[in-house]
């Protein structure tokens, strides 16, 4: 039966996978290198979302009829899949769904207990989702804001005193050069031992460094479904203790079990603290399918996803590093291959590449403070790889870049 956004059946055996396992719908003459912004969606994820809209499109967590109960089961499965992917215990953590990573971070930072923290700690290298939300937190609460430097290996440079009664918000993987943040376990345990709270931005790490996250026990992890092969969605996996401590100012249906003229009673389930109103049920269900697809990639395709991505990243790095008139900022093997183009504007170069079917990101990637104020760099070009990319994509990119850069 042919059904779904792309009207193509999902592959079922390794023999049918080809080079673009899960992405057979993609045109051969187009190469997408912007997975750091949002990944493309494998066919099973599209099928799962379409199946919801076509066969049981109902509200969840508030109805008794069959379609709604099926939604309940699928959403519960997605919550469990989030915690399982991160290696978090459902006895201590709960998964809430929201708009995106930025929204999830702001929901937390705007509702944390007043007077709880002495300072907020982050780094100079953060995405605006962290950099601006921590800035606003400090301005609103009047606490000190500490901006940490990173070493050449990405390690955070801090004193133990910085962590005392601190709200620490940092990324697990940088979105400019793909560097994973080392020493997160020590940062988390050190902060928590000194009465602080740690929130991780895992938007990049979920798809490109999940092994780096597993085993960590922060107070909250925020990420986006659309960066890990799911639909557009935000996720907050937080301790029940943190969620129950929030001073809620964003309220609505789905959070309460009783309401009177001047009071309300909250549901006992901690995940509801961040879920005011109806949720994007189809997107949540698609996230569950995406996490299952990632988890089952090796068995279904015969390849290890991380190894495959690293090999392609090395091919791309090696092809670009040999070219003149560009300065690479990322390390070999990183899923992000970012460079400063010399003698040509980054946006113009991205336009030229697009005409040849090569789609890349140009600009500052929401890291304006670090790249502009601190490093005084011009706009950059970023290739970011995903599960859909192939050696043919890399060859097309390098073959297109070569005459452009040599002709400058």
List each model region and its residues.
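Pyridoxal 5′-phosphate
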Residues: 1-408
């Amino acid at each position: 039966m042919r059904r779904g956004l792309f009207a193509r059946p999902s592959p079922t055996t390794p023999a049918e996978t080809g080079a673009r396992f899960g992405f057979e719908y993609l045109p051969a003459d187009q190469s997408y290198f912007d997975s750091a912004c949002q990944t493309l969606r494998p066919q099973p994820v599209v099928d799962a979302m379409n199946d919801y809209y076509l066969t049981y499109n109902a509200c969840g967590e508030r109805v008794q009829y069959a379609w709604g109960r099926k939604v309940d089961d699928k959403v519960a499965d997605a919550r469990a899949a989030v915690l399982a992917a991160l290696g978090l215990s459902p006895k201590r953590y709960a998964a809430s769904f929201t708009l995106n990573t930025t929204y999830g971070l702001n929901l937390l930072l705007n509702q944390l207990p007043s007077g709880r923290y002495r300072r907020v700690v982050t780094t100079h290298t953060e995405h605006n989702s962290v950099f601006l939300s921590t800035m606003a937190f400090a301005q609103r609460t009047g606490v000190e804001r500490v901006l940490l430097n990173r070493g050449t290996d990405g390690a955070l440079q801090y004193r133990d005193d910085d962590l005392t009664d601190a709200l620490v918000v940092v990324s697990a993987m940088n979105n400019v050069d793909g560097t994973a943040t080392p020493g997160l376990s020590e940062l988390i345990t050190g902060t928590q031992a000194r009465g602080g709270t740690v929130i991780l931005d895992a938007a990049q790490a979920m798809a490109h460094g999940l092994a780096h996250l597993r085993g960590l026990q922060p107070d909250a992890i925020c990420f986006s479904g659309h960066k890990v092969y799911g639909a557009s969605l935000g996720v907050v996996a937080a301790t029940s203790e943190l969620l129950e401590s929030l001073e809620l100012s964003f309220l609505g249906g789905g959070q309460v079990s009783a309401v009177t003229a001047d009071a309300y009673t909250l549901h006992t389930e901690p995940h509801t603290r961040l879920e005011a109103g109806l949720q994007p049920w189809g997107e949540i269900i698609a996230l569950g399918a995406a996490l299952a697809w990632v988890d089952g990639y090796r068995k279904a395709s015969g390849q290890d996803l991380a190894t495959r991505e690293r090999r392609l990243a090395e091919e791309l790095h090696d092809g670009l590093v040999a070219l003149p008139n560009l300065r690479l900022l990322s390390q070999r093997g990183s899923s992000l291959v970012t460079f400063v183009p010399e003698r040509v504007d980054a946006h113009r170069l991205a336009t030229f590449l697009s005409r040849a079917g090569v789609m890349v990101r140009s600009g500052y990637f929401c890291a304006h403070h670090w790249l502009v104020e601190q490093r005084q760099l011009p706009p950059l070009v970023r290739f970011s790889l995903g599960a859909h990319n192939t050696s043919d994509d890399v060859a097309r990119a390098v073959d297109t870049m070569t005459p452009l850069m040599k002709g400058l």
